[in-house]
Amino acid sequence: MAYHLFKDYDKTNVLIGDGTGYATKGAKYFVAECCEYKDHFLWYHPDYAYINNIEMDHVDYFKSMEQYEQSFEKYANQAKKAIVIWGDDPHLPHLNYTKRVVKFGVKDGNDIQAKNVINNEKGLSFDVYIYGDLFGHFTLPFYGMHTLYNTLGVITLGYLEGMDFDYMQSQLSTFKGTKRRYVVKEVGNNVYVDDYAHHPTAIKYVIEETRTRFPGKQIVAVYQPDRYSRGLRFAKDYARIMDTVDHPYFVDFPKNAPKEPGIDIDVSVITKNLPRSKVVTEDEAGAKELAQYDNAVFLFMSPKDIYKLEDLVIKEKEKA
């Protein structure tokens, strides 16, 4: 989203976390998506360190929330111009910063604040106030509060680089989303969604967006955990969040999931906390089980290739 906002403002290069990107000579801006895993992001010394949130993850490397926060604090303070943070986060505002901090959010006390937020099946609309003054009213084809926060953060970056309201409203309204983030297929009266979500909070956001975007449809959610340490650490959280959908399903860890010392589990570490859930396989049998539902939104969530099961379900329903 940040790249999309900047690319028509001035020449902009981009590097996304999956290794893809775009570059041209003489670009003024370089937007890079960096990851905290194994402190990889400490190699970066950006002009702006833009941090959406802090929530414990990558538990095979980070052993405590204190260690996690220390890494983010160090990364943030490597910024040259400013640190841009979600001011409503329970952790970010309390870190020790040595550079200018600009906070965005919906709560009072943020430098960039969204007010009068409307979030429904038509999209998002909200007023943006900057240091107390109305900047403009945004109407965008996005869904969910998590998307509002992402958008507000990008608006903050644009403001810091001198963009005006008209440019940002126009440019953001044409943003089509990111790879493997809420990719929608509508076939008949059913909706199929592929999403990279792998942290419990990300799954929660996907479910919330679905309820907003497709009210009245039942939700069939399928999640495949990818790392044993993450599955073990967040087992109860996965179960609690998946319990909010009509029909919760899980797929076992992939066969190529990296082995981790001292951890010998399967997906039952999660499902035992949610007895009404079912386990399906990524084959025709699994597709038949899921295809029994109609007028539904099917959520397929995992960093792995669970979208292949989505394709099988669509084919199975076409047989009916």
Q: For each predicted feature, which ranges?
A:
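Inter-motif core of Ras-like GTPase G domains
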Residues: H45-E55, G216-V222
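A short, aliphatic-rich alpha-helical micro-motif
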Residues: T24, W43, A76, M242-D243, ...
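Short beta-strand-centered segment that lines the nucleotide-binding/catalytic pocket of NTP-utilizing
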Residues: D10-G21
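Glycine-rich phosphate-binding P-loop
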Residues: M1-A2
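ATP-dependent carboxylate-amine ligase
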Residues: Y97-R100, D133, T156-T178, V184-A320
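Switch II (G3) loop of P-loop NTPases
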Residues: Y29-Y37, Y192-H198
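Acidic, Mg2+-coordinating active-site environments of NTP-dependent enzymes
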Residues: K7-D8, Y48-Y192, S268-S277, L290-D294
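Conserved acidic residues
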Residues: K28-Y29, D47, K81, D246, ...
